[in-house]
C-alpha cells in the first residue's frame, strides 16, 4: 500500500520512526579484505579491484589537466552555467559559516582562546557509475577550500571507457579540487586512508556512497576522520490545512525517486489534507520516469502520520530527526521554534528540497537514519580544527595557584604541582 495513514501515538513513537538503514555489518568482512588488499598491494590492487567491480582497466588513475580542459570544451554550456551559479551560491553560504579565532582574559594575567586551523588534506568521495553527481563535488570541495584545506582529493568511479564524466571534471575544477582520481568503491576509501604509489593519504574522508563505501569509511575511521554515517535519503513534511496538497505530493515523489529505500513522511493534523495528498501521489506516479523506484519506495517507507495538532507533529519530527524537513504550515517560522533535530530545513511552500540540493547554497551532504539527533550536515567547520591557546603571566600564576596546586595534589600528580610551583618561585 502506498503512503499508509497511521494515527500518532507517543507509545508507538519508536516504531513509527523506523525506516531503512544501511546495515553495514553484513559487508564488513569483504570490505576489510578490500582495504587490506589496497594497503598491501597499492596501485596494483586498485587496478585489480577496479577491473573486478567496475569492469574497467585503468592505467593512470589521476585525471590529467588535458582531460579537464577537454571536459570544459565538451560540456553543454547550459549545464556549465548552472554549475557556475550553484558554485557561487554554495561559496557565499559557506563563507558565512567560517568561524573566527578569539582570545579572552579569563582571570587577570590568564589569557585563553581558540584558534581556527584547516585540516591539511581531505578526500571527497563522489558517487558515480550509472548516475552522475557533479553537485556533490561542489558540496564537498567548496567548503573544504573555504576552510583553507591545502590538498583536496576527489575520487569517483570511472565510466566503462575509463573516463570521468565531463560535468564531474568541470565541477571539480570549478570547486578547487587539487587532484582527481578515477577510482571508486571501498578501494577508493582505502587508497585515500592509507595511500598508494599514486594516491597520497589524506586526513579526512567525506561524501556519500553505497553500502560498501559506508562500510569502508567506518573501518578506516580512527586512521582518518570521516564526516558521518550515511544511509538512504529521506524527507519529513510537517503540514497543516493551509498547505498545498500538490506541492506535498510532488515533494514526496521527488524524494522517493532517489532509491527504493528512500523514506517519505507527511505529518499533519488535517485528515482531509492527508487523503488529498495520498490521492495525488497515486495519480502522479504514472507520469514519473522513475515510477517503479518511486512505487517501491513508497510501499516500503512512505507514511502519513495524523496528529492532534502541530505540536504533536513537531514532537514526532524531533524523534524522527529527518535528513530533510519541510515545514508547510500557516506560520512556518513559529513551527520552526520547536525543531531540534533535522539535517536541513525548508520553510514555507515555496522552499522545495530540490532548491537545497542544487541551488540555494546550503549543503546537501546531510545526516540520515536519525543521525541528525547528534550530527550536523557537512559545512566549512567540517574541515577545520580548533586548538586552544593560553598565555599566563606571573600575576596569572598567583591567581591560579590555589586551584591548580590543590587539584594536582588531590589527584596524586605531584610533578604537575611542582611544574607550576617552580614557576611561582622563579
Swiss-Prot record:
Keywords: Amino-acid biosynthesis, Histidine biosynthesis, Metal-binding, NAD, Oxidoreductase, Zinc. It catalyses: L-histidinol + 2 NAD(+) + H2O = L-histidine + 2 NADH + 3 H(+). The active site is at 323 (proton acceptor), 324 (proton acceptor). Binds 1 zinc ion per subunit. The keyword Metal-binding applies. One of its GO terms (cellular component) is cytoplasm. It comes from the Archaea. The keyword NADP does not apply. This is Histidinol dehydrogenase. It comes from Methanothermobacter thermautotrophicus (strain ATCC 29096 / DSM 1053 / JCM 10044 / NBRC 100330 / Delta H). The gene is hisD.
Amino acid at each position: 500500500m502506498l503512503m499508509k495513514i497511521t494515527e500518532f501515538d507517543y507509545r508507538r513513537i519508536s516504531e513509527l520512526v523506523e525506516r531503512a538503514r544501511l546495515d553495514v555489518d553484513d559487508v564488513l568482512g569483504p570490505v576489510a579484505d578490500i582495504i587490506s588488499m589496497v594497503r598491501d598491494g597499492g596501485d596494483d590492487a586498485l587496478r585489480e579491484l577496479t577491473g573486478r567491480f567496475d569492469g574497467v582497466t585503468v592505467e593512470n588513475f589521476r585525471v590529467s589537466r588535458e582531460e579537464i580542459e577537454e571536459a570544459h570544451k565538451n560540456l553543454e554550456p547550459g549545464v556549465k552555467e548552472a554549475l557556475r551559479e550553484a558554485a557561487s551560491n554554495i561559496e557565499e553560504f559557506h563563507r558565512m559559516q567560517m568561524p573566527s579565532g578569539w582570545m579572552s582574559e579569563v582571570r587577570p594575567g590568564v589569557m585563553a582562546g581558540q584558534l581556527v586551523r584547516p585540516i591539511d588534506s581531505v578526500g571527497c568521495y563522489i558517487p558515480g557509475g550509472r548516475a552522475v553527481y557533479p553537485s556533490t563535488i561542489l558540496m564537498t570541495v567548496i567548503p573544504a577550500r573555504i576552510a583553507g584545506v591545502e590538498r583536496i582529493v576527489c575520487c569517483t568511479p570511472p565510466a566503462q571507457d575509463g573516463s570521468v564524466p565531463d560535468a564531474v571534471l568541470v565541477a571539480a575544477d570549478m570547486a578547487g579540487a587539487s587532484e582527481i582520481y578515477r577510482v571508486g568503491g571501498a578501494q577508493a576509501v582505502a587508497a585515500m586512508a592509507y595511500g598508494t604509489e599514486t594516491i597520497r593519504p589524506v586526513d579526512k574522508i567525506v561524501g556519500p556512497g553505497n553500502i560498501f563505501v559506508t562500510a569502508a569509511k567506518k573501518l578506516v575511521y580512527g586512521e582518518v576522520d570521516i564526516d558521518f554515517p550515511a544511509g538512504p535519503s529521506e524527507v519529513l513534511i510537517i503540514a497543516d490545512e493551509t498547505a498545498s496538497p500538490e506541492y506535498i505530493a510532488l515533494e514526496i515523489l521527488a524524494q522517493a525517486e532517489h532509491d527504493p529505500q528512500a523514506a517519505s513522511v507527511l505529518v499533519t493534523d488535517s485528515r482531509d489534507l492527508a487523503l488529498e495528498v495520498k490521492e495525488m501521489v497515486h495519480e502522479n506516479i504514472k507520469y514519473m520516469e522513475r515510477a517503479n523506484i518511486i512505487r517501491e519506495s513508497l510501499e516500503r517507507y512512505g507514511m502519513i502520520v495524523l496528529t492532534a495538532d502541530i505540536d504533536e507533529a513537531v514532537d514526532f519530527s524531533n524523534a524522527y530527526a529527518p535528513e530533510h524537513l519541510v515545514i508547510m504550515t500557516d506560520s512556518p517560522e513559529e513551527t520552526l521554534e520547536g525543531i531540534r533535530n533535522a539535517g536541513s530545513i525548508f520553510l514555507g511552500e515555496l522552499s522545495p528540497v530540490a532548491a537545497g540540493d542544487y541551488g540555494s547554497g546550503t549543503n546537501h551532504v546531510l545526516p540520515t537514519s536519525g543521525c541528525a539527533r547528534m550530527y550536523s550536515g557537512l559545512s566549512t567547520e567540517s574541515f577545520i580544527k580548533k586548538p586552544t591557546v593560553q598565555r599566563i603571566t606571573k600575576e596569572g600564576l598567583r591567581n591560579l595557584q590555589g586551584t591548580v596546586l590543590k587539584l594536582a595534589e588531590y589527584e596524586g600528580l605531584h610533578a604537575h604541582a611542582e611544574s607550576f610551583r617552580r614557576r611561582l618561585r622563579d
